[in-house]
Amino acid sequence: MGNIITTNRLLLTPMNENDINFIFMLSTQYETYKYESDNASSYEKIMKNCNWFIERMQALPDDGAIRWIVRRENVMIGEIRLWCENDKTHDWEIGYGFLKEYWGYGYASEAVKAVIQYAFEHFNVHRIAAYLNADNNKSAALCERVGMVKEGRLRENRMVNGIYYDTYCFSILKREYR
């Protein structure tokens, strides 16, 4: 099986149908996705999204998408999504979520950094961007730790529970990642 990533402490494997229950459980944890506009997704919506990622893996490395399950000592602790936003400019987007009990140990930073490196080395990527709720200070700090640059602020372009929020855009270019 390709697209497996290992770090000193973590194993990242491409998501498969057996992982959908974990993704659903993770996505329903309020603290993990409270800044997202679709934080109360139904099982059917989560399953549809997971199947989209599984199908889009076939288009890698020039286009497509992949979702990794992050494991620590064979326990699922989070997930990372990477997908092509524009195959002409080789612009990709990254997203992530981790179980709250694993916050503060550097696992998210370690995994995101490994995915960025893997993407630049194995996929046709020029730029990787992360778009996050401007109130999500922990995610903003993570982006900075892994070498991403804050590009700007999109004003009131996302809605969470009926309230508009701003979005920060962070990115890293292939020439910057080392």
What positions do the PLM features span?
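Soluble sensory domains of the PAS superfamily and closely related sensory modules
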Residues: 58-62
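Conserved GNAT-fold acetyl-CoA-binding loop/helix
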Residues: 31-55
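Acyl-donor (CoA/ACP) binding surface of acyl/acetyltransferases
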Residues: 1-34, 64-178
